[in-house]
A protein has these predicted regions:
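Extracellular low-complexity, O-glycosylation-prone Ser/Thr/Pro/Gly-rich "stalks"
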Residues: 25, 36-97
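Beta-strand-rich binding-surface signature
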Residues: 28
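Fungal secretory targeting signals
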Residues: 1-22
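A short, ordered amphipathic alpha-helix with a cationic face
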Residues: 19, 35-36
Length: 97
């Protein structure tokens, strides 16, 4: 019976590590739309925009550039609004305006 309990615990630990991996990569810059695709960044994006005295409309949420400060929650800070659109820099690279 003990062996059957170990397997579910190991599976839960593996899933927890996968969930924790859905954060931005420290030091990279991200478009809002890419942060939303990575994980549950809606509240953090709104908070970063409000802290920077920026509007929280869809355009600013999706087309602003944010810096990944890192930490357990993948903390972010607002860099700028990309009026001409935010561009995906590709995997492992910073996004840009």
């Amino acid at each position: 019976m003990v062996k059957f309990t170990v397997l579910p615990l190991a599976a839960m630990a593996a899933l927890a590590s996968l969930a924790a991996a859905n954060n931005c990569k420290t030091g990279l810059n991200y478009c809002g739309y890419n942060l939303l695709g990575i994980g549950n960044y809606g509240a953090q994006i709104n908070g970063a925009l409000e802290t920077a005295s920026q509007p929280t409309d869809d355009g600013h949420i999706h087309e602003s550039l944010f810096h990944c400060n890192g930490g357990n929650n993948g903390d972010i800070s607002f860099i700028s609004y990309c009026g001409a659109g935010c561009k995906d820099g590709g995997s492992g690279n910073s996004d840009f305006c």
